[in-house]
């Protein structure tokens, strides 16, 4: 993206410089600086025709039908994001910061404080390599705007790296400002943070955040966020890479998952909790891998939703993520749902992989997996054409509940290596419009089993393992053309287009 002369003129007139912080010992760290950024670190252009505005979560469907008429985006659980101005389509030409580092520097036992509007406390630019040890960073502002510029480009983040390396060790970061992310890596920024406590209090204030291709590595953090659209682990337009090991990540606001993923994120040996939101949201061509983590979510009821979920993989076409396959992988650890169903995928291609996860279901346990179109009132795709194309692989996994699919979706369900499914597989055409040619193909290997709890419908069934009813009796397997493949002794029937055993 090229710099725009008009944008430069406008920004020169409106950007404010202010705040207080540690004075620099040399010009490498300028106090109360306004730093001009080149466009090299701007994210890739959004998909053609894809509008995009504000907050963690997208709104506008691919057919252009508007979502919220106020132009703001809202998270999937329907709790609207914060207010704030509409975002610009390219990175800002400059950032305000109290302590701006443009040359290599290491400092210890210092405090960096910011009180200015949309101002960072610490900013790393110009390829500098900066290390801060035993630090305190405080970002407080009553008039910061938040919104897209904070979500997409890091405006107003407490610690921001846009071009250079920032290493943070053994510190504390606190923010009380709209758009006050704890740590933000954007563009050519590369952040490494360890043994640090991060607390954010207002909206659009993620704990650790990447966008525009930024990179962030975190170890042994304690992160708490309290605002809306403030995921503890957050990413946004342009994505990036996050690698996280250990620590505790808690989000308390509505519309604030523990992890909001429009990037490639890997987390191991960490505790992840969303107290008023789904646990995980992944949009578009992005991935989340969890290993030996504890994960919990508690999505509130909301009239905009047609169901409640704990982990969602979807696509809104807002421009915040590239269209493509969303990937969720979880090995070991535990997953707890406090409300609604467990896994939901709609209006996207998606892939799930589960292995040895200890699952605690919500009291309602609405579904184990829902792979269907949607009637979400925000408009995720064209109604009747917004199904999912999903591959779900369970490896040495116990799982319970209903699996739902429809004729505008395609589901490949693979039970492998000793997996046990206790539940039913149902074709639910509620949100399928006039229908389509979607399929549900189930494969059960020789070591795996399906305990059937209700009459089920699939397109094809390959079973090298075992199928029994919850009543302990054999299950009838009947072709859609009336062919009797198996005459069971129990009350349950599986209807399938084809059967192989």
Tell where the protein language model's regions lie, with residue ranges.
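Residues in short coils/turns that link rungs of repeat/solenoid architectures in beta-rich domains
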Residues: 114, 139, 175-177, 200-202, ...
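Disordered, low-complexity segments in secreted/periplasmic proteins that are enriched in proline
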Residues: 21-93, 317-319, 378-383
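C-terminal motif of bacterial Sec signal peptides marking the signal peptidase cleavage site
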Residues: 15-19
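All-beta strand scaffolds that present successive hydrophobic residues in beta-strands
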Residues: 104-109, 129-135, 166-170, 190-196, ...
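N-terminal segments that cap or nucleate solenoid repeat domains
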Residues: 81-144, 487, 491-501
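Acidic/polar low-complexity surface segments
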Residues: 75-91, 136-162, 180-182, 186-187, ...
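Extracellular beta-strand/loop-rich repeat segments of large surface/secreted proteins
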Residues: 406, 410-501
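Positively charged n-region of N-terminal signal peptides that target proteins for export
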Residues: 1-11
């Amino acid at each position: 993206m090229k710099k725009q002369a008009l944008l430069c003129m406008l920004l020169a007139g409106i950007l404010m410089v202010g705040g207080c912080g540690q004075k620099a010992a040399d010009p490498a760290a300028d106090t109360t600086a306004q730093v001009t950024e080149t466009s090299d670190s701007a994210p890739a252009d959004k998909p053609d025709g894809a509008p995009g505005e504000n907050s963690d979560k997208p709104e506008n469907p691919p057919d252009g039908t508007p979502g919220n008429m106020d132009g703001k985006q809202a998270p999937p659980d329907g709790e609207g994001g914060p207010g704030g101005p509409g975002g610009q389509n390219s990175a800002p030409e400059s950032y305000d910061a109290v302590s701006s580092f443009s040359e290599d520097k290491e400092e210890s036992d210092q405090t960096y404080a910011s009180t200015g509007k949309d101002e960072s406390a610490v900013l790393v630019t110009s390829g500098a390599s900066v290390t801060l040890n035993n630090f305190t960073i405080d970002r407080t502002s009553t008039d910061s705007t938040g919104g897209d510029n904070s979500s997409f480009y890091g405006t107003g983040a407490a610690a921001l790296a846009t071009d250079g390396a920032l290493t943070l060790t053994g510190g504390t970061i606190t923010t009380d400002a709209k758009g006050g992310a704890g740590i933000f890596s954007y563009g050519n920024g590369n952040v490494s943070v360890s043994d640090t406590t991060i607390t954010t209090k207002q909206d659009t204030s993620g704990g650790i955040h990447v966008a525009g291709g930024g990179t962030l590595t975190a170890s042994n953090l304690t992160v708490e966020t309290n605002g809306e659209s403030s995921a503890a682990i957050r990413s946004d337009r342009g994505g990036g890479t996050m690698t996280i090991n250990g620590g505790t990540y808690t989000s308390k606001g509505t519309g604030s998952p523990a992890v909001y993923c429009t990037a490639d994120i890997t987390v191991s040996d960490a505790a992840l909790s969303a107290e008023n939101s789904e646990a995980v949201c992944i949009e578009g061509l992005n991935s989340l891998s969890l290993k030996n983590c504890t994960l919990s979510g508690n999505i509130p009821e909301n009239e905009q939703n047609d169901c409640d979920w704990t982990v969602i993989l979807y696509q809104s076409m807002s421009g915040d993520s590239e269209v493509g396959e969303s990937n969720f992988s979880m090995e070991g650890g535990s997953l707890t749902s406090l409300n609604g169903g467990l896994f939901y995928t709609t209006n996207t291609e998606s892939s799930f992989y589960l292995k040895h996860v200890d699952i605690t279901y919500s009291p309602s346990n609405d579904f184990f997996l829902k792979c269907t179109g949607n009637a979400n009132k925000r408009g995720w795709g064209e109604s009747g054409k917004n199904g999912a194309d999903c591959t779900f692989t369970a490896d040495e996994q116990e799982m319970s509940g209903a699996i739902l699919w429809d004729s505008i979706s395609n589901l490949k369900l693979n039970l492998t290596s000793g997996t046990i499914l206790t539940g039913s597989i149902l074709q639910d055409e509620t949100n399928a419009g006039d229908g389509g040619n979607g399929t549900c193909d189930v494969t059960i290997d020789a070591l795996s089993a399906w305990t059937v709890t209700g009459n089920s419908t699939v397109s094809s069934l390959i079973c090298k393992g075992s199928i029994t009813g919850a009543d302990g009796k054999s299950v009838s397997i009947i072709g859609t053309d009336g062919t009797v493949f198996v005459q069971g002794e129990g009350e349950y029937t599986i209807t399938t287009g084809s059967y192989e055993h």
